[in-house]
Amino acid sequence: MLDREGFRPNVGIILLNARNEVFWGKRIGEHSWQFPQGGIKYGETPEQAMYRELHEEIGLLPEHVRIVGRTRDWLRYEVPDKFIRREIRGHYKGQKQIWFLLRMAGRDCDIHLRATEHPEFDAWRWSHYWVPLEAVIEFKRDVYQLALTELSRFLNRHARVPLSPYGTHGPHGMHGRHGGPRSQALSRAQQAQQADADCNAEAAHATEHDSPATPVSTSRSTDD
């Protein structure tokens, strides 16, 4: 689905953890890293497309994130001809994107790269918000800069510690705050700490595969 100017509507996702680090995914079978993104289907709103892509690419559900902000307008980039399939050259010009800034509300092990039969990434990592843009494929750098800059004003909004494995009813939620035997609270806290440790170990194992210090650029078009 292209607009009259030849741009495909698309959403981009900048996912933050509690330390304001951002999620980077490694393209499957490649040595290139990028933010999650994907096209908006006919009849979808940008927000609906964002939640669909979030699940398809990294396995997260709406309850695992909070929307912190989004870009006011479409951000566009043109794709060089060498990256465009021959059959659509002359019609397809590039992408126009609405970017969402999300805050992780779940745990690292809620991220699943094989949530669908057609995974986009085979590894992931958290990285500093202002990762050098030399690491991004050249024709997308301006859009990344615009999105990161516009959304940076939201960085301290809704900053929080990730949810415990008990949600709002665990040792760090309603029940933990408002009473219960001390011994039970301590026991639940110990269980939560162990669950978080197991989760972090699982997530660390998932990110160990070929993770560079910073994402590196790719020579392949990432216009999906």
Swiss-Prot record:
Signal peptide: none annotated. It comes from the Bacteria. Residues 214-224 have a biased composition (Polar residues). GO terms for molecular function: pyrophosphatase activity. Its EC number is 3.6.1.-. It holds the Pfam family NUDIX. Residues 6-149 form the Nudix hydrolase domain. InterPro entries: Nudix_hydrolase, NUDIX_hydrolase-like_dom_sf, NUDIX_hydrolase_CS, NUDIX_hydrolase_dom, RppH. This is RNA pyrophosphohydrolase. The gene is rppH.
